[in-house]
Design a protein with these regions (language model features):
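N-terminal intrinsically disordered, cationic/polar leader segments
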Residues: 2-65, 69-145, 149-179
């Protein structure tokens, strides 16, 4: 029995949930999200709650039960409050700027990196912090990981892009040979 899966998901007043078989459409103040769930999971709307149940007791159905409930909960949270991932850049001459749907990064390469933000994702730059906002948790995390991959932090000086919650384990440099 899934501890996570059996918890019902409360639907706030501003959120509208439509269920059509395995396709669930969630609409709220921050946008609209659609997701197709696994066929072994049954999703039902009861009053101001959404309940997720397995179709049968197979291993696949039980494993998808908790996943479906978590994804659905993230959809409701995303359309009400949204999600944010913050990246911090550290290095001499490193800069970032947002113009429309493009994120321009100067990360010590011979050329600036132009990253086109996907639909539904916004970026804000404050000094040396890039904030990525969106209603889809998976997409926000994916975009943050892609941006971080342009210049991952190195362990000697800590230069590069890192999540603000991430700690980089620093290494000691080489010590000169003694004569």
């Amino acid at each position: 029995m899934s501890r996570i899966g059996k918890k019902p998901i409360g639907i706030p007043d501003k959120v509208e949930v439509k269920i059509n078989g395995t396709v669930v459409d969630v609409k709220g103040p921050k946008g609209q999200l659609t997701y197709t769930f696994h066929k072994d999971v049954k999703i039902e709307k009861k009053d101001k709650e959404v309940v997720v149940n397995p179709v049968n007791q197979s291993a696949t159905a039980r494993s998808q039960w908790g996943v479906a409930r978590t994804v659905l909960g993230n959809m409701v949270t995303g359309v009400t409050t949204g999600f944010v991932k913050s990246l911090e850049f550290n290095g001499v001459g490193y800069k970032a700027a947002v113009s429309g749907a493009n994120l321009t990064l100067n990360l010590g390469y011979s050329h600036p990196i132009e990253y086109k933000l996907p639909k539904g994702i916004e970026a804000k730059v404050n000094k040396n912090v890039i904030e990525i906002h969106g209603s889809d948790k998976e997409l926000v995390g994916f975009v943050a990981a892609q941006v971080r991959s342009f210049r991952e932090p190195e362990p000697y000086k800590g230069k590069g892009l890192k999540y603000t919650t991430e700690t980089i384990i620093r290494k000691a440099g080489k010590t000169g040979a003694k004569k």
